[in-house]
Amino acid sequence: MTANDFKALGIAVFTLSDTRTLETDRSGALLAEGLEAAGHRVLTRSILPDDLWQVRAALCAAIAERQVDVVVTTGATGITGRDIAPEAMEPLFDKALPGFGELFRHLSYDDIGASTIQSRATAGVAGGTLLFAVPGSTNACKMALEKILLGQLDLRTKPCNFAMLLDRLGER
């Protein structure tokens, strides 16, 4: 495989919500469908309650699964008491990727103005797996998918991308 080839990545999509179901979850569906349309394999898509320990357990299980290269969560990135995505995810990071949240908020500013500062979108690497947490709004998921994730999960994106680094993320 060369840097000009596409490589399908194994991806887990988790929606963090106490109110959504797989049938009503438009944001998780948008992410899963967009990733599959790009050629990736969505290995699991599920709804997780806004519970720190259940979310962290699901993240740990996905990280331990060798076929999962990437985990994308949607929801629970705000500032209310039930918004626990960063608290569940960030302690697992071997390396944080602060540029993801910075770029996400920068791009969101064009759509929602200064309200973007309420987003705690985050990303990092844990156990050789890429983890991304994006807000639950469908527009936020669409923007993150189209303007950040699809390019960074594609070997053909130049000058660099996350896909080309996957084999090296677990180096010690």
Question: Model features per residue range: what roles?
Answer:
Residues 1-172:
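Non-catalytic beta/alpha edge segments that cap or flank active sites
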